[in-house]
Amino acid sequence: MTRSQVLLCACPDLKVEVQDLAQRLTQAGLKVRVSPPLCTPAGLQEQRARLQAEPGEWLVAACGPAQHHGLFQRLAGEGILPVVNLLEEDHLEGAEAAILTALGEEIPVAPGEVLPHREVLVVGGGVGGCQAALDLANAGIKVYLVESSLSIGGTMAQLDKTFPTLDCSICILGPKLVEAAAHPLIELLTYAEVTGIAGRAGHFSVDVTLKPRYVDMSKCVGCGNCAEVCPVIVPSRWNLGLKSRKCIRIIFAQAVPLVATIEKEYCIDCQMCLTACEHSAIDLNCQPEERRLEVGAVVLATGAKPFDPAIRSEYGYGRLPGVLTNLEFERLVCATGPTQGYFQTPAGQPVKRLAFIQCVGSRDQRFLPYCSGYCCTAAIKQAMLALEHEPDVEVTIFFNDIRTSGKGFEELYLRAQAAGVRFIKGLPGRIEAGEDSPLVIVYEDQRGGHRGRLPVDLAVLSLGLAASRQELPFAEGGPVRDDQGFYGSPHPVLQSLESTVPGVFLAGTCQGPRDISETVCTGSGVAARIINLLKRPSA
């Protein structure tokens, strides 16, 4: 059985003449009805009336099905209403051929409807992934929250304060992490890796490998006795190398789950932790655990990564001790950081002069040609934090353009100016080791029209956000990425939270730079989309 009825949309954006196309289709023996634009009230009324007055199998020829397919399907009731995209057709011949091809396809007779799985996989336990998981679970949907790190929380858990309100980051994030862990419909799978994704929307099979912690999570109480006796000291990745830690440790004080982990590559097998643990939680024979999950939808909240500052060698990162990244600065001023919040250089010296350099990697055709969005306001926030710790510190921000476009961001910028933060337009050419100061920044003031050398104790590089490019193992090809490596969407305006794979959704910075509030919004947005998806049967 094939279709022979066409509902032709008189969309003003079509590149072909609708009446001419209707005439050609009529001459081909088809029943054609031209409707006002179907995305208008008049067009919707016309479509409803047409389907009621002339029942049967219709085909809609309009703009892209990605934009309005769901709307057309709802109006079709029980029937199957395919949509042919005419926006891509430049000539009458091509438009006619596309419609005739679609009309020639067989119509499935009485397709079996299978209820989709009412479970969802969320990949990434940052604030966006946690928000999506909580919204889904609160709607009665089972969630598997997979996080590659030892704790959920993501980058936000490493920050001291958030902008523009300067709230304590972990103070507002911590309760959300605890809520996610305690929710009866959320299963945390931390220190885990997705090893396979197969299937389709409503019916995905996902393989997950849980790496061994060498600690029994059901017995560990997070007391830290094991770390106290461990003799192996290694750099702390959580503190970005600014502090050391033990081979066995809890990743940070507010970690969820609050469980110790042994990194076997550093372990010398002294078994002192085994003796020190009063709860018999140490299990040196742990093996990886394999899980198979059946889910109806997948949320990718895998985040982004900071630009590698070593590429900008003129700034001396990794060579000059006083040159830090903006995330390292956050750890330096954080009360739970390597100095317990004491504002000092990595060498332990007081900070009297501080400078921020913007757009490190961003807005540079050699590296990241786009604006990373968050960096200007983050640097202003960090300048205010420096003044909170040391009111007499001299703070300078070297900028390309100040872009504070979020709610309350411009007000924070004005507060920083009033507090004495100096803004110099122009990105420095290089950073040198100084004779009378740790560092000297060589710059050109584009507004003042002069060159200068600024002695500072610390220079903070505001890094752009780059795509992580971590590929997930989709059996039939994963979501398409854009030119910069971020996940793309079928439509950047109408379907910005969806990937190019049906049933796979995007939250947070995996699809482009975002700040925390935007990331939280995307988490809630994908949850709403999935709740609607899992209501419907799937063929």
Features from the language model and the residues they span:
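Residues forming the flavin
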Residues: 1-539
